Every structure is written in C-alpha cells, then in structure tokens.
C-alpha cells in the first residue's frame, strides 16, 4: 500500500485499452500515403495466400486460413469458417474481427456469402452466420 504522499508525488496510471482487432482501426490515405485512425466493423481485402494450419494442443485438425492484404495495406491472417470454401489467391473477401482460440496469430474471420466468398452448401441451421440462402420448401 502506498502512502498518500507517494500517491501525491506519482499518481496511479490508468490502463490503456488495447484493441482485439487493430487492423480494423486503421485507414489509408492514398493521396498522402499515410495511415489514418478510422474504426470500421469490417474491411475488404485480397487473399494473398490460402492454406491450412494445425491448432494448438490439445486440439487436432487442419484449419483453413487465408492471408489477406486489406484495403489499408495491412496484411493479416484470417480464418475461413464452415465446411468447404471457394477461396483462392486474388479472391476479394470481407473481414470481421474475432479471434480463433486454438490458432495463434489469427484475429480475424472471413465473412461467408459476401464479395467473392460463397456461402456454405447444404446448411440448414445457423445459416446467417455462414451466408447460406433459405432452402426452397
């Protein structure tokens, strides 16, 4: 416990809150070629690499991911949710925040059913999360 005098001389510092998805908080001014502070819920980007990676222990799988260059020129790793996908290099995708707990360094999700990303086929439940249209009755 500090004394009152110690707190008067050097007050407590408030914690600086850090963003969970920092690439969504940056914009790019192409005229000045500078980064700007713009908060966005999603960002558009182009896939530079699509592949699979293995999760941390104790899980075992081949998780699909894409390396994406965003419209603000930041390159990030994003998870491709759902079973099967149609993404390849140069596909234009929409990114949202949200990490994948068992993949280190993956802090973003690709939005299914937006831009070049197709929705998941034959999905009956939680369709809106996977960009699947309502099946014909």
UniProtKB/Swiss-Prot annotation:
Residues bearing the modification 3-methylthioaspartic acid: 102
CDD domains named in the record: Ribosomal_S12
Pfam family for this entry, one: Ribosom_S12_S23
Coiled-coil segments on the chain, per record: none
Keyword presence, Ribonucleoprotein: yes
Ribonucleoprotein recorded as keyword: yes
Matching InterPro entries: NA-bd_OB-fold (IPR012340), Ribosomal_uS12 (IPR006032), Ribosomal_uS12_bac (IPR005679)
Gene3D superfamilies (alphabetical): Nucleic acid-binding proteins
Domain of life, source organism: Bacteria
Protein's GO biological process: translation
Family affiliation: Belongs to the universal ribosomal protein uS12 family.
The protein's assembly and partners: Part of the 30S ribosomal subunit. Contacts proteins S8 and S17. May interact with IF1 in the 30S initiation complex.
Protein name stated in the entry: Small ribosomal subunit protein uS12
Organism: Enterococcus faecalis (strain ATCC 700802 / V583)
